[in-house]
């Protein structure tokens, strides 16, 4: 190789490594931003839950809070109060991830003192960055989400509103959360607690539900479409178009040529609900249910999903598409790094919780950079090998002198490295004036062959060179 060509291989390798490092740094930044955003979204949900509990508390205790607040002096609601009254679960923490504590400040409306308004404010702890405040304000779903940037004013998401904290008798600092509960919001909360609505309210079935017995005072219920009940007790007759019954209807068995329609439950005390052919159970309203069309599978009608707040258990669970979890993946069985495994692609964990993956029939630590060096021996002329491992193999060769020819040949050297038949690295000197050795290194992808050759002079008059080889692999 000519003198002015020396170093190009090293320069190209260095440039490639620099590009890889830049890409890794860029990707790490993107991942960090994603993790931060998910954390802020979680915080926003917690604030929404807390605010919803405070709203319900105010609605339940509207009259009491009217008596303990003025237009300038607030009634303060704390997390402890919400937990003690059952509006928050007992496990709800007093502070958020930044050590900030939520409180609701309830005051009378200045224009109409008979009505209440409130501001939920966080205080103490470590301030959130502005980026987090803006994100959380937009993600808060109960009330009007906002934030405090100057320590004095609450500003709404997208700067849609701005209110001085002093209007609510609240105090906080910059980098904190604020949620506005308007007069209309709290009036609705008060109405929710003590009214039985005559009309359906979308998303609020509780407003059409009785929570105690109702006494009709011997008056009638007229124009009823259907009466659905668990039991019925009648002091007189039950009259219908097709039959009159003074007691229970009992029978050993019944046969019907067409349909059986029941206005209530169909119950079996000690038997099965048996169907034949490819039929099963169907919910007519929503078009879902279960059936069997072969001897192996219980199927969902119309490919409906199955939803439960409990546990789904089976010998194996298979997803033909993606597998999602809204929380964490718990791997109960442990494996040992370095032990054999099958098939490749399995994911497990060791007894410390570190993730392992099955690679080339061996459990390996995910992302591990620990490797080992292997002495691949001393060779003359050429050496061929293959990377049979599951990760990149790094080859290091030194020497390349034609010492057996003696004289000037002992001072010349040459090493050439090939990967998959392509020349990757060269280091050579034909100057016989002084002694020297050559050194080359190159990477070999998994499953790829490689070769090292050593013939010190271009016309090979000095014969084959002697060199040593080492390999490094994770």
Curated annotation (Swiss-Prot):
This is Shufflon protein A. The keyword Transmembrane does not apply. Residues 1-361 are annotated as: Constant region. This protein is expressed by a shufflon (= clustered inversion region that works as a biological switch). The orfs of this region share a constant N-terminus, while the C-terminus is variable. Keywords: Plasmid. The keyword rRNA-binding does not apply. Residues 362-474 are annotated as: Variable region. It comes from Escherichia coli.
């Amino acid at each position: 190789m000519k003198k002015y060509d020396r170093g190009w291989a090293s320069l190209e390798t260095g440039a490639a490594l620099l590009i890889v490092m830049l890409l890794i740094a860029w990707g790490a930044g993107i991942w960090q931003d994603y993790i931060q955003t998910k954390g802020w979204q979680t915080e926003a949900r917690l604030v929404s839950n807390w605010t919803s509990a405070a709203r319900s508390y105010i609605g339940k205790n509207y009259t009491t809070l009217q008596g303990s607040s003025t237009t300038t002096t607030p009634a303060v609601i704390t997390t402890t109060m919400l937990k003690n009254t059952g509006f928050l679960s007992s496990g709800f923490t007093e502070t958020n991830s930044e050590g900030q504590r939520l409180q609701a400040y309830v005051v009378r409306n200045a224009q109409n003192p008979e009505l209440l308004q409130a501001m939920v404010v966080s205080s103490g702890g470590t301030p959130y960055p502005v980026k987090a405040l803006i994100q959380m304000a937009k993600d808060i779903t109960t009330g009007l989400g906002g934030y405090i940037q100057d320590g004095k004013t609450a500003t709404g998401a997208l700067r849609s509103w701005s209110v001085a904290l002093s209007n609510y008798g609240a105090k906080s600092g910059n980098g904190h959360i604020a949620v506005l509960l308007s007069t209309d919001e709290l009036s609705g909360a008060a109405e929710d607690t003590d009214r039985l609505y005559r009309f359906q309210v979308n998303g609020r079935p509780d407003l059409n539900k009785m929570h105690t017995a109702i006494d009709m005072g011997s008056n009638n219920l007229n124009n009823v479409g259907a009466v659905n009940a668990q039991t019925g007790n009648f002091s007189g007759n039950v009259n219908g178009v097709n039959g009159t019954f003074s007691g229970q209807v009992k029978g050993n068995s019944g046969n019907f040529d067409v349909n059986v329609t029941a206005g209530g439950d169909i119950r079996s005390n000690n038997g099965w609900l048996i169907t034949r052919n490819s039929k099963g159970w169907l919910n007519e309203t929503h078009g879902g249910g279960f059936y069997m069309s072969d001897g192996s599978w219980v199927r969902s009608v119309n490919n409906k999903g199955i939803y439960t707040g409990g546990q789904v258990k089976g010998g194996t669970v298979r997803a033909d598409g993606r597998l999602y979890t809204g929380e964490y993946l718990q791997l109960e069985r442990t494996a040992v790094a370095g032990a054999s495994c099958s098939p490749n692609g399995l994911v497990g964990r060791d007894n410390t919780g570190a993730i392992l993956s099955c690679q080339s029939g061996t459990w390996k630590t995910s992302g591990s950079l620990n490797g080992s060096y292997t002495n691949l021996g001393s060779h003359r002329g050429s050496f061929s090998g293959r990377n049979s491992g599951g990760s990149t193999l790094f080859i290091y060769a030194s020497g390349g002198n034609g010492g057996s020819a003696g004289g000037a040949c002992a001072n010349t050297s040459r090493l050439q490295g090939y990967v998959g038949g392509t020349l990757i690295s060269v280091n050579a000197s034909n100057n016989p004036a002084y002694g020297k050795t050559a050194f080359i290194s190159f990477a070999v992808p998994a499953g790829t062959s490689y070769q090292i050759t050593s013939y010190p002079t271009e016309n090979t008059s000095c014969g084959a060179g002697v060199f040593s080889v080492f390999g490094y692999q994770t």
